[in-house]
A protein has these predicted regions:
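Beta-sheet-rich non-transmembrane sensory/scaffold domains
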Residues: 1-228
Length: 228
């Protein structure tokens, strides 16, 4: 949105910082014309490489903001996947897989390489990345920032960790034994502060296919509460 140059290839050379629309957007065209070579093609046997992957970098997982430090904490998914266009011959009228009123994804992404994660502290006023914590697994959970300058984040291997709000160095961790995809919350009772997080989540195949150590992970649903 800031109009700065970006790596890789996209359907547009950039975004208009005022409107948020592609700079080559034509309001009078019925169909927008993409940059040549930016769309998928059947000419590449391996498919078209997309970076970040279809689920990342930043997805729906909630970010958090520390107003005292002026930092935004963003959980990200690091990695790429491939999109391959395959000719579809069997459609509804031929008895194919597309059925009325049933969900159809049109295919699934190919993720031949392992996906990782990262936690970033960003100055939202300038876009400058102040700190980065590289993570072993993709981030599927949200972030919590506290007034005590701690940042909490759960991970796919069941690790629930606290990081320093300035450096993002890990300060504490505890493995709950089940994947974490929920954002933690904090509250106080009689002057005592607590942090709670729901655990237990579906193991997404595109993640565990290249992380075999996660295949035997339990997916029990539980609520964990920690005191500060």
């Amino acid at each position: 949105m800031d109009g700065r140059d970006k790596p890789g290839h996209d359907g547009t050379p950039g975004l208009d910082p005022k409107t948020g629309k592609p700079v080559n957007y034509n309001p009078n065209a019925d169909m927008q014309v993409y940059n040549e070579g930016s769309h998928g093609t059947r000419a590449k046997p391996k498919g078209e490489k997309l970076c970040p992957s279809h689920n990342g970098g930043k997805n729906w997982e909630p970010s958090a903001y520390n107003p005292d430090l002026g930092l935004l904490y963003i959980p990200s998914i690091e990695g790429c996947n491939y999109i391959e266009l395959v000719e579809q011959k069997d459609m509804v009228d031929q008895g194919g897989p597309v059925k009325p009123r049933e969900r159809f994804m049109g295919g699934a992404p190919k993720t031949p390489d392992r996906l990782y994660g990262s936690l970033k502290a960003i100055d939202p006023a300038t876009g400058e990345i102040k700190a980065v914590q590289k993570l072993e697994y993709p981030n599927m959970a949200g972030v919590l920032a506290t007034a005590g300058n701690l940042v909490f984040l759960g991970h796919y291997d069941g690790t629930f960790a606290a990081y320093d709000a300035k450096t993002l160095n890990e300060m504490w961790s505890f493995n709950v034994g089940s994947p974490i995809q929920a954002p933690p919350v904090t509250y106080a009772v009689n002057g005592k502060q607590y942090v709670a997080v729901l655990v237990g989540a579906r193991m997404w195949p595109y993640i565990i296919q290249n992380a075999p150590e996660l295949k035997n992970q339990m997916t029990a649903s539980m609520l964990y509460v920690f005191s500060l």
